[in-house]
UniProtKB/Swiss-Prot annotation:
Pathway stated in the Swiss-Prot or TrEMBL entry: Metabolic intermediate biosynthesis; chorismate biosynthesis; chorismate from D-erythrose 4-phosphate and phosphoenolpyruvate: step 3/7
Molecular functions per Gene Ontology: 3-dehydroquinate dehydratase activity
Source domain of life: Bacteria
EC number in record: 4.2.1.10
Record: active site: 24 (proton acceptor), 99 (proton donor)
Protein name (database record): 3-dehydroquinate dehydratase
Catalytic reaction annotation: 3-dehydroquinate = 3-dehydroshikimate + H2O
UniProt similarity note: Belongs to the type-II 3-dehydroquinase family.
Gene3D superfamilies cross-referenced by the UniProt entry: Dehydroquinase, class II (3.40.50.9100)
Organism: Shewanella baltica (strain OS223)
Alphabetical list of InterPro entries matching this protein: DHquinase_II, DHquinase_II_CS, DHquinase_II_sf
């Protein structure tokens, strides 16, 4: 496998499938990651995954990765984490921002993202399918001639 993508999932996403399924869907994070691993395998891309409720663990994973692309669902850190933004900018790895729900159709405090202005693209409101869209876009970019 010639390319590697880091999938980063932030706080409370470990509760997918039981936390507000009307907003976030019924799939668990393990289900979503398993589907993404299949998609990556078909494209001959390695997918590395981390989920943490601790900001520093996500930052450390970003600092340590040798991936060429990142897909991140910062979850609640979207609206609060300058440190996570700085980690992404510090490693200078292109990234896609993903949200299960349409954050712009929710509470006003969820409308602001510390990541969107630096992301290649933002995908929100498509549920778990948003991850699939992001992975397909990341793979396509990685396979483009330099």
């Amino acid at each position: 496998m010639s390319h590697k993508i880091l999938l980063v999932n932030g706080p409370n996403l470990n509760l997918l499938g039981r936390r507000e399924p009307s907003v976030y869907g019924h799939q668990t994070l393990a289900d979503i990651v398993a589907e993404l691993n299949q998609q990556a395998k078909l494209a001959e891309v390695e997918l590395e995954h981390i989920q943490s409720n601790a900001e520093f663990e996500l930052i450390n994973a970003i600092h340590a990765t040798d991936a060429q692309m990142i897909i991140i669902n910062p979850a609640a850190f979207t609206h609060t984490s300058v440190a996570l933004r700085d980690a992404l900018l510090g490693v200078a790895i292109p990234f896609f921002e993903v949200h299960l729900s349409n954050v712009h159709a929710r509470e006003a405090f969820r409308h602001h993202s510390y990541f969107s202005d630096k992301a290649i693209g933002v995908i929100c409101g498509f549920g778990s399918q948003g991850y699939e869209f992001a992975l397909a876009a990341a793979i396509k970019r990685l396979n483009q001639p330099q």
